[in-house]
Regions:
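Structured, active/binding-site neighborhoods that engage oxygen-rich ligands
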Residues: 1-331
Length: 331
């Protein structure tokens, strides 16, 4: 397999891996995860009665992966263009198709935006106030189709993919960080270099959208990197990351946390997503973002075949086909 296609497929598969690994403990505190599974490894079904994913089977993904593949297909079908109107239309179509607006499946910003879009609102107005991580969780495909040498173009594309649900500087900043890391990894950058590219993109992204009171995503990402490099064991690292950076659905916590587990796991998708699943908090989304970045570094071959078989069969996704299509429109 071509190296660039391998990275693109690895990115999409890593995203699904982190999502499915984190699904059972989504929005649980670390203590509850430990009491239920000990150290969580591999795929598990959702615990009976889980407030969000009750009934999900082992290896099943959530809205993180579903929205990312929706965005990927939208970009593919537009020959690499990223247009807010297209993404808004397909976001509503996806939500209707899977019944996403029922129950607690959607994040708060996306749920509000989708209802407004259904009523016919302008997609450039429906993302007002959206500061959670729904833009960052689905953004990896933009990193697959935009090159790191033109961060303004990457930031433009991220903004177009985000504005209908998350039109705030902080949300776009977080999404730019993820897309920037993925984009640089696709070009063969090393881990520190790709993170610097992501941080540079995040700084640009913060200037877009509504300006709200929020901590700096790049600054908190640097804190997460510092914690990841400490000489502690993994349990202690995760506790420090949870306590000092956070693991909630806000962009300012979850995106830096994803960077932290990415660095701690050395860019290995299996190790990175396992760390994310054991962190607590928004484990599926942190795992999806971290897994996408790690997969773009390590490629599809870093994910065991048996693991990939579960992801593709349970969720009816094809990371290789989609990755190949996106590489074909990369610019």
């Amino acid at each position: 397999m071509d190296a660039v296609i391998d990275r693109a497929a690895g990115c999409l598969a890593g995203l699904a891996l982190g999502d499915a690994m984190g699904m059972p403990g989504e929005l649980w505190v670390p203590e509850r995860i430990r009491a239920t599974w000990g150290w969580l490894q591999g795929f598990h079904p959702a615990p009976s009665g889980h407030a969000i994913v009750d009934g999900f089977v082992a290896g099943q993904v959530t809205d993180d992966t579903q929205q990312a593949f929706m965005l990927a297909a939208t970009i593919r079908d537009a020959a690499g263009e990223v247009r807010a109107a297209d993404v808004a239309r397909e976001l509503v179509a996806w939500a209707d198709r899977v019944g996403a607006s029922e129950g607690s499946f959607l994040g708060p910003s996306s749920a509000r935006a989708i209802e407004l879009l259904r009523s016919g609102a302008d997609p450039r107005t429906t993302g007002s106030g959206g500061d959670t991580n729904g833009a960052a969780m689905r953004i990896a495909p933009v990193g697959l189709v935009r090159r790191p040498g033109d961060l303004d173009a990457l930031t433009d594309a991220v903004t177009e993919a985000s504005v209908m649900s998350h039109d705030t500087g902080v949300a776009i900043s977080g999404a730019c960080l993820i897309a920037g890391v993925v984009s640089a990894a696709m070009e063969g950058a090393d881990l520190p270099g790709a993170i610097e590219t992501g941080i540079a993109a995040a700084r640009r992204g913060r200037e877009r959208g509504e300006q709200t009171v929020a901590a700096s995503v790049p600054a908190r990402a640097r804190l997460a990197v510092e914690l990841a490099g400490g000489g502690t064991d993994d349990e202690t690292f995760l506790r420090e990351l949870y306590d000092l950076v956070g693991a909630w659905v806000t962009t300012t916590e979850s995106v830096p946390a994803a960077v932290g587990v990415l660095v701690r796991g050395g860019g290995d998708p299996v190790r990175v997503t396992e760390l994310a699943a054991n962190l607590g908090g928004d484990t599926d989304t942190i795992g999806a973002m971290a897994g996408a970045m790690a997969g773009a570094f390590a490629g599809l071959g870093a994910i065991p075949t048996a693991t990939l078989d579960v992801l593709t069969s349970v969720n009816d996704i094809d990371p290789v086909a989609m990755g190949t299509a996106l590489v074909g429109v990369r610019r």
